Design a protein with these regions (language model features):
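Chalcogenol-based redox active-site neighborhoods
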Residues: 1-114
Length: 114
């Protein structure tokens, strides 16, 4: 889901986000920086998206987006969410209700909210 729908949507709509005054699109995942770099290259994000790892879940736990997927062999992961930050202040934070979903946090849906 992430590589097929979620991330590509933000790459596709990057210019529209810029038109709305969004300075940076950052993708945060519970992975190390090497995985994030490879994932970014595989999805041709270029300089459109900052790929940021949260391997120890520090940020993910701080915002309450951690989910236990141990039953699926994945351990503690991050739920999908979108966050709009302005001057270091969170303006909007929307988290998916279903961890397998990509509706609320989809690029086209979030674009309409900023």
């Amino acid at each position: 889901m992430c590589s097929a729908k979620h991330l590509p949507g933000y790459v596709e709509l990057h210019d529209k986000y810029k038109e709305k005054g969004i300075d940076h699109i950052i993708c945060i995942s519970v992975n190390d920086p090497f995985v994030m770099n490879a994932w970014g290259k595989e999805n041709n994000v270029g300089d459109k998206i900052i790929m940021m790892g949260d391997p120890f879940l520090n940020f993910t736990k701080d915002i309450g987006a951690d989910v236990d997927k141990s039953g699926r062999g994945l351990g503690i992961r991050s739920n999908r969410y979108t966050m709009y930050v302005e001057d270091m202040k969170v303006i909007k934070l929307q988290e998916e209700k279903d961890t397998g979903s990509c509706e609320i946090s989809a690029a086209e849906n979030f674009l309409n909210l900023v």
